Amino acid sequence: ANLTGANLTGADGIDPRRHNDLLMLLDQPGAICAYKLVRGDYGSPMGYGPLYYTVGTTLTEADADTDATHDCGRGINLATLPWAMREWTEGHRIMLVEFTAADIAAIPLGGTFRVRKCTVIKELDLVELGLVEPVAKPKRVRKPKVAA
């Protein structure tokens, strides 16, 4: 049977390790990087609190939702790069963040997951990602040389 898109929340006998590639994050030693889609002002696009993801900032959410059946919940919701690029709209930014496996609160299906703590490393270049066109530089007009 093709169960693509099926909601199996609460189904018995389902082993998420067979279906959720992001569970590999739990086995990673040391620092792990992921992505955060933010508004133009670096604020979180969701309404769980005024979190701002500026470079160098360490964010914490001690009371993050640990229920993996909740796609989006209280906490610092991060994503894969394909997810962030797919959900990106004009005026938004994509940030690279760093965390550890111990910081992970929940890993639902779908390309997103929640952490309790992360540090913002850098802002990704939207031109390099192919999400926006490069800004055209104005052409320099050369002044003709005046004969002496």
Show which residues each predicted segment covers:
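A detector of tandem-repeat and repeat-rich interaction/domain scaffolds
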Residues: 1-14
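Long, highly charged low-complexity segments enriched in Glu/Asp and Lys/Arg with interspersed Ser/Thr
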Residues: 117-139
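Arg/Lys-rich low-complexity patches in intrinsically disordered regions that function as generic
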Residues: 139-145
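Long, positively charged binding patches that form subdomain-scale interaction surfaces
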Residues: 15-73
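Polar low-complexity intrinsically disordered regions enriched in Ser/Thr and small residues
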Residues: 8, 43, 59, 113-114, ...
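ADP-ribosyltransferase catalytic core
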Residues: 61-124
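Compositionally biased, low-complexity repeat tracts
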Residues: 6-9, 52, 71, 126
